[in-house]
Amino acid sequence: MFAGRKLVIATMHQKEAVIAPPIENILGVDCFVAKNFNTDQFGTFSGEIERKLSPLDTARLKCYTAMKVTACDLAIASEGSFGPHPSMFFVPADDELLVLIDKKNELEIVVREISTNTNFSSKEVSSKGELIEFAEQAKFPSHGLIMKSGGLSNQQILKGIQDWELLVNTFDQQIQLYDSITIETDMRAHCNPTRMEVIQKAVAKLIEKINIVCPTCGTPGFGISDRREGLPCSSCGFPTRSTLAHISTCQKCGHTREEVYPHGKTNEDPMYCDNCNP
């Protein structure tokens, strides 16, 4: 289905470094990056351009736009989001979506990788000591920083700082004009090796999912599409909100398969039961 075809990677931040090698090796495709393709048009981490769509729809739009400008019918794009972990609210997380779209075969395969392995952070600093402390905690200079100064109407943003001399000199200049400076981690992939590692894990997940084919029609990407609650409480037997089954669906033929007790648990702790612990 994929072997011998061209595949465009929708990126301007060097994600092809971790996407292309395994994808080419496993799928037998020829990966390339669209020239002068500006993914900042879909939103920036530094805030100048707001992301207007959901992360998934943004990744889809990247794919379709890259396919349009390159006349290619196979694309991959990723979209990252940074903030509190969905279940560990006080822990920052990198939430990466990776999407493969095959227009020729009308196929879309999506994977998600959520990781607490991130240096995502920002701080308002007013002294060189605070600046250096933040930079060291953020793994600078191997990981880039962003410096913001000025108000909303005249804000100056310097991205991709990965040199101590540039960081300190820029701070010295700006702190003479403003009481404080906002310093942030640069989360763009080419400035953040830790994020690249998370994207690499998402690529491994994507390949794993592609290799799972529908048992009926053989279409790649046969994976979990839904979950069914109702794992019984070990004390009272009442159905809990925990997962009882995973449901996998084929995009092509619609074949479904239900896997009961997907986590190897046949019952749930009473602390998660609305009957025992309302």
Model-predicted segments: where are they?
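Compact, glycine/acidic-enriched structural inserts
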Residues: L107-G144
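Cys/His-rich short segments
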Residues: K201-P278
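N-terminal beta1-alpha1 ligand-phosphate binding loop
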Residues: F2-I23
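Fold-independent oxyanion-binding glycine-rich loops
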Residues: T11-M12, S78-S81, K103-K104, R112-I114, ...
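N-terminal glycine-rich phosphate/adenylate-binding segment common to multiple enzyme folds
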Residues: K62, M67-D102
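Active-site rim beta-loop-alpha module in soluble metabolic enzymes
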Residues: A135-V203, E208-V213
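N-terminal beta-loop-helix "entrance" segment that forms/cooperates
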Residues: F37-T58
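N-terminal segment of the mature soluble domain
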Residues: A20-Q41
